[in-house]
Each structure stands twice: as C-alpha cells, then as structure tokens.
C-alpha cells in the first residue's frame, strides 16, 4: 500500500511501557547491538578453549544452544525449506569459515569473512524493494569495511595465489551469513524460537565433521563451563537476538552496526589482557563508528508500492 511503513509495529504491547523503545526500529537496533556485543566476547571466551578442534567446539556449543531451547521445540515445526535454509546458514557459515582458516592465513581469511556486513548493506535493496540504497549507505558500508580491515589486519596484508582455496571459502562464508541473515525476513514468517532447532541440527552436523575430519578429542571437565558460556552466549543466544533484529529492523543499518563486532572484540581482548590497543584499532574504530552513525541517522525507508 502506498505510503505504508516498511517496518512492523512493536511485536509485544508490553514493550510500549519503555519510552526508549518507540518502534520496531528502536527495538531491532537494541537487539542487533546486544547480539553484536555478545559476539564480540567470542574471541575472549574462545581463548579458553583454543585447545579443542574447531568443529568439536562449534558442535558442542551449538548443541548447548539447541538443548537449552528444547522447551520451545513445538515452535521448531517450520517448512522444510525454512529449516534447510536456517540449518544450512548456521552450519555452512562455520564450515566454510573453518575451511578458510585451514587453507589461508588467519588474518586474510578473517578479513574476507568481514565482507558479510557490507554484503548485507548492498544486497538489502535487491531483496526488499521498500529499502533504498543511497550514497551515504554505500560510502558508510565501504568505510565500515575498511575500518574492520584495519582492526583485523593491523595494516599487514599479504594475499597470495597459493591460498586461493582459503580465500574462496571465506567469500562463501561471508555470502552464506549475509544470505542467511537477510532470508530470515524474506522467508514466510516463522518463530524466532525455531533458531533452536537450527542450532541443534547444525551442532549435530558439526560434530559429524569432527568425527570425520579431525582427531577425536574428549573435552575435560574444566572445559564444560566455557562450552556452556559460549553455547548460551555468542554461539547460541546471540543468534536468537540476531534473528529477531533482522526481522524487525532496517537491514542496511544493522549491516553497518555489524562492523562494530571486530572493534568490540579487540577492545574486550585488550581489557582481558589478551591484546593491545594500537593506532590501527583507533583508526579503524573511528571509521566503523562513523559508518554506524550514518546507519543510525539515515531516515527509514517507506514502501512505494
């Protein structure tokens, strides 16, 4: 309908009691920032479990997220296409990301992986005609990516043809996560609780990859607490917040906010004693904050048809 808002009203009347949550856009912004802050803790928490093989770690943490959400399992009954896309998005992203880390230097692979926020910004208008991609969004998107590149690479990059397979895997990971994120709103409506089913299925597939591709390892009892924290936080709970944010908000703005992830992750490592603050982090952080500010100040789009 002409002139109708592209965004939905608040999903719960109770939320109207909070004056700082005035619309679904405000709620989506808060949910996205919460997910981003939780994801930023992944590196600091992951250091505690660096001795575990990657697929084992992902499998265990996603399984924790799925098991924790079993009380909502009735909401997991979604169309097969939705379940396949949700599971494929979560599992496929981590599979190709680890394939990239195995076949390319970590800095370059991680940098390519951070194309996903830019892809969300650039692809949103093609999937959602009610969203317009203006020059400020494009410039902010590339500024955010450059900022993320500076934070991740510390000014040191060396792309070599020998690592082409790893680079391609990182590109696929970025496209998979951007595609999964955008599809949560493009698919027929499904409850956010269904993400628990996606996590459990993805965790099972990751554990299968551990059995087939990695040396078998039995975690120690001292690992249990950290696995639970990861599964309830950056490798679980954050996915639920992200799903709801993408359904309610402006995908362009959320994409720009996502560039905060590597910056916040670095700052948390600095605070926890696992990293140091340098000029690259400060310069990249300035670009990322500028990009996020553009996204937050840009006027919301309206559907024209």
Where is each model-derived feature located?
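Specific transmembrane alpha-helical segments of multi-pass solute transporters/efflux pumps
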Residues: 38, 73-113, 148-150, 231-249
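Hydrophobic/aromatic residues within transmembrane alpha-helices
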Residues: 49, 57, 100, 126-129, ...
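Glycine-/small-residue-enriched transmembrane alpha-helix faces in small-molecule transporters
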Residues: 6-56, 88, 95, 142-146, ...
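Helix-helix packing/entry segments at the starts of transmembrane helices
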Residues: 30, 109-115, 183-203, 235-271
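Hydrophobic transmembrane alpha-helices of multi-pass small-molecule transport proteins
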Residues: 64-65, 69, 122-123, 133-155, ...
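Loop-to-transmembrane alpha-helix entry segments
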Residues: 78-81, 110-113, 129-150, 160-167, ...
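Specific alpha-helical transmembrane segments that line the substrate/conduction pathway
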Residues: 56-59, 63, 98-132, 173, ...
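Hydrophobic alpha-helical transmembrane segments of multi-pass integral membrane proteins
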Residues: 27-31, 53-70, 84, 137-146, ...
């Amino acid at each position: 309908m002409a002139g109708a808002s592209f965004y939905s009203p608040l999903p719960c009347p109770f939320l109207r009691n909070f004056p700082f949550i005035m619309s679904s856009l405000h709620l989506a912004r808060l949910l996205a920032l919460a997910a981003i802050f939780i994801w930023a803790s992944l590196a600091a928490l992951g250091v505690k479990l660096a001795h575990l093989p990657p697929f084992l770690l992902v499998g265990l943490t996603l399984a924790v997220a799925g098991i924790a959400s079993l009380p909502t399992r009735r909401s997991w009954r979604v169309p097969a296409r939705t379940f396949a896309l949700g599971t494929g998005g979560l599992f496929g992203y981590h599979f190709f990301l680890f394939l990239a880390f195995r076949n390319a230097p970590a800095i370059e692979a991680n940098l390519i992986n951070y194309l996903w926020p830019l892809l969300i910004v650039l692809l949103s208008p093609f999937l959602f005609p009610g969203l317009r991609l203006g020059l400020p969004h494009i410039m902010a998107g590339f500024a955010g990516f450059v900022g993320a590149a500076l934070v991740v690479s510390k000014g040191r990059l060396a792309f070599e043809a020998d690592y082409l397979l790893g680079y391609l895997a990182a590109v696929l990971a970025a496209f998979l996560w951007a595609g999964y994120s955008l599809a949560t709103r493009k698919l027929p409506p499904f409850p956010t609780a269904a993400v628990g089913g996606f996590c459990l299925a993805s965790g099972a597939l990751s554990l299968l990859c551990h059995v087939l591709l990695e040396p078998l390892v039995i975690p120690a009892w001292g690992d249990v607490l950290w696995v639970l924290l990861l599964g309830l936080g950056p490798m679980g709970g954050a996915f639920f917040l992200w799903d709801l944010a993408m359904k309610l908000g402006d995908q362009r703005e959320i994409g720009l906010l996502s560039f905060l992830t590597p910056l916040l992750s670095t700052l948390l490592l600095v605070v926890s004693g696992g990293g140091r603050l340098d000029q690259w982090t400060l310069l990249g952080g300035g670009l990322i904050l500028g990009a996020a500010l553009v996204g937050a100040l840009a006027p919301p789009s309206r559907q024209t048809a």
